[in-house]
Amino acid sequence: MKVNGVEIEDTFAEAFDIKVSRILVTAASKRLAKIAAREATGYGTSVIGCPAEAGIDTYIPPKNTPDQRPGFTIIICNPSKKKLDHELLERVGMTILTAPTAAAFDALENAEEKVNTGFKLKFFGDGYEKEGEVQGRKVHIIPIMSGEFIVEEKFGIKSGVAGGNFFIMAETQGSALLAAEMAVDAIKSVEGVMTPFPGGIVASGSKVGSKKYDFLDASTNEKMCVTLKDEIEDSEVPEDVNGIYEIVIDGIDEESVKKAMKVGIEAACKVPGVKKISAGNYGGKLGKYKLHLHDLF
């Protein structure tokens, strides 16, 4: 199969179950809302080493937010519900509560359960906090130096999908990078997903475990390293490929992740120099979802 002349390998991305929460961060301006959203999703590339996977989902205009202010939805994920509950409290408390003019609301539809993030945060008010309501949502109003911080009492959690992915293989590192940036920009049009790595792009793709060091949970994916293609017998890097980047996608459900993979691949295939699109799978060691590339089209 080819898309815009680019080979799409007959393979699949291996994704896995994860618990997700979706939060709407609003502020007095779009700029301030994005700053708060960025801070809240920091250090969230991979649960291999980070306490959560996190990223910005989409911009929400004032007409569609509870407080009629600009906002961004963010997605925060962890395989453990208990750890995700902890991360919500830490991230909302340390990065949104502290951000100028910011507020936080639940933005997850069809939640399987709710956690008391806002209720726990109210105690920062030291007895001066109040209960309130914004567009039918129960909130806690916490007095702060600059005015008030408003946070919804409960945040939803549900089962989502993490690890949707594809590899962009190109003639040069530059063309691979441009294609990766185009893919990430296209994925931003899909609600309910995020790309957790820096700029949405993975430079150092990994494999499960290690061939040499038993203390590692993950190590470099040597089969996809362009500098090793002439050094190892089982290299999967084509002769005419000298640049590879990976895009990883987490989302609220399988269909959203698959939609994001499709639009990302289509965007990448428009860039001159892109030779092939592949995906990462690990023999079932990672997760139960098999997102076949050909099925996306």
UniProtKB/Swiss-Prot annotation:
Catalytic activity as recorded in UniProt: N-formylmethanofuran + 5,6,7,8-tetrahydromethanopterin + H(+) = N(5)-formyl-5,6,7,8-tetrahydromethanopterin + methanofuran
Family: Belongs to the FTR family.
InterPro entries in the cross-refs: ForMFR_H4MPT_ForTrfase, ForMFR_H4MPT_ForTrfase_C, ForMFR_H4MPT_ForTrfase_fd-like, ForMFR_H4MPT_ForTrfase_N
Keyword flag Protein transport: no
Any one GO molecular function term: formylmethanofuran-tetrahydromethanopterin N-formyltransferase activity
HAMAP family for the chain: FTR
Designated name of the protein: Formylmethanofuran--tetrahydromethanopterin formyltransferase
Subunit structure, as described in the record: Homotetramer.
Pathway annotation: One-carbon metabolism; methanogenesis from CO(2); 5,10-methenyl-5,6,7,8-tetrahydromethanopterin from CO(2): step 2/3
Gene Ontology cellular component annotations, sorted alphabetically: cytoplasm
Claim: Plastid is one of the keywords in the record: no
Subcellular location: Cytoplasm
Matching SUPFAM superfamilies: Formylmethanofuran:tetrahydromethanopterin formyltransferase (SSF55112)
GO biological process: methanogenesis, from carbon dioxide; one-carbon metabolic process
Function: Catalyzes the reversible transfer of a formyl group from formylmethanofuran (formyl-MFR) to tetrahydromethanopterin (H(4)MPT) to produce 5-formyl tetrahydromethanopterin (5-formyl-H(4)MPT) and methanofuran (MFR).
NCBIfam families: one_C_fhcD, PRK02114.1
Keywords, comma-separated and alphabetical: Acyltransferase, Cytoplasm, Methanogenesis, One-carbon metabolism, Transferase
Chain ranges passing through the membrane: none
Coiled coil: none
First-listed, main subcellular location of the protein, grouped into a coarse class: cytoplasm
Domain of life: Archaea
EC number: 2.3.1.101
